[in-house]
Design a protein with these regions (language model features):
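Lumenal/extracellular ectodomains and adaptor appendage modules
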Residues: 1-236
Length: 236
């Protein structure tokens, strides 16, 4: 679409498609296959694409029970299930996330003498765009942030520890960038901005240690969802 139509025409086409899809949903809501609908909601929740917030406390508690609240850890509860947060946000004002591969690997947990548990985590971010594709990017897709090249996948990367935990021994290989330490309501995290041009990769490796209060609860990962699965499926 973006490669074949100018911006003005593509905007109109997308508006028409969205309107037709919405009319179809509302007009055929009585014919919906409930099983498929529930499956779609479950997949969206599992991938972190479906999140919700309710102003009413009772409703918000119900949302939390379903696991789609996407809230950061409770800073006052170090005994909660430990979660490693790996988040990134596009700062290039673009649609280049289609070319972003994000792979996070969590190593085997090592129990420490003080009751904490340490995990070695590796986050690999890659702009899989080829040089040929970079040379043909339409304006609607290319980066438009100040001082950014057209193929620049500029990302803010944030790595969160669980409540009562910490991050240490952090290294960056490949495309270099700085990660600064900070806290959010007492929860430690590292954050920085990386520029990935066509074909470039950065690999972040660090040790995440959970709290002693979390005991033997396994560490889980919460990561910003990407287009990776949809892109690979479309090209299969």
């Amino acid at each position: 679409m973006y490669w074949n139509y100018p911006v003005e025409e593509s905007d109109g086409i997308f508006a028409a498609v969205a309107s037709a899809a919405f009319d179809k949903i509302l007009g055929g809501i009585g014919d919906v296959d409930v099983t498929k609908l529930v499956g779609a909601f479950e997949r969206g929740a599992e991938e972190g694409r479906l999140i919700a917030w309710m102003r009413n406390d009772d409703e918000q508690n119900a949302i939390k029970e379903t696991g789609i609240d996407a809230s950061l850890p409770d800073p006052d509860d170090p005994s909660a299930d430990p979660v490693a947060g790996v988040y990134f946000n596009n700062l290039s004002f673009s649609k280049l996330d289609w070319y972003l591969n994000a792979d996070t690997q969590i190593g085997q947990g090592i129990k420490n003498g003080d009751g904490t548990c340490s995990y070695r985590i590796t986050v690999t971010l890659t702009n899989i765009m080829t040089q040929e594709e970079a040379g043909k990017l339409p304006d609607y897709v290319a980066a438009s942030a100040p001082d950014a090249a057209r193929d620049d996948e500029r990302l803010n990367v944030s790595l969160f520890a669980p409540t009562g935990g910490n991050i240490s021994d952090l290294t960056v290989e490949g495309t270099q960038f700085g990660l600064g330490a900070a806290t959010w309501h007492g929860i430690p995290f590292y954050s920085g901005t990386v520029d990935l041009h066509a074909g470039e990769t950065t690999t972040i490796t660090y040790t995440l240690t959970t709290s002693a209060e979390a005991g033997d609860k396994p560490l889980t990962l919460r990561q910003t969802p990407t287009c990776q699965a949809a892109r690979d499926s479309a090209s299969a």
